[in-house]
Amino acid sequence: GASEGFFSFQNALDDPAMLLHLDNGVFYEFVPLHERGDDDPTRLTVADVEPGVRYSLHVTSCSGLWSYEVGDVIRFTQTFPHKITVAGRTSDMIDEYGEAIYGDEVLAALKSACDATGAHVSDYHVAPRRTTNGDQPGHEWLIEFESAPDALDDFERALDEHLQDVNRHYHIRREGDALDGPHVSALPDGAFYNWLQATNDDISGQTKVPRMSAGRDVADGLLAAADRD
């Protein structure tokens, strides 16, 4: 569900995917995520979607008076009946160097690294790390750990290995030495909350930390908040 309407619900306890609600006064269209931002992107109906593909969800009232991009990225696990999982937000993507990393890949990489090192993450943000002094560009992972790994190098290596396994664009750039591996900056407890307080007049359940950014504004703000602690 969302403020725009009620879209899906879980109908089986052993399946985390949600059944798309097709009889609720909402017309759905799905834009392949790689076409988002194009002048004339493909807009598919439920008849034409494919399982496993990332789509940006668009909804239109049955009267056609309004149409809206919800901001969620979804993937179908099956069709007829149509079941979906939420793969992240449309803003959760970094493609500064041709690596095209999505939010669900970042979340899965974090889980893999936590499983490998015994760490637990309470908050995170990923941003580009610009090239300096001839170094290769890469990504900075700003992480507030609930339980930190014994060695950040092992955590970084696990992140890198997972991303190379699941993302061929990332793998090609890493293999070609065009992209450096992940760099983790461990932030002190409360750094993310302090940043939220500094950048929002009011904090509520709807106040969220952006998980990924194509720029450095959030990352630099978080580092500044950490330095003030």
Task: Explain the meaning of each model-derived region.
Residues G1-D229:
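Active-site glycine/GP-rich loop and adjacent strand/helix microenvironment
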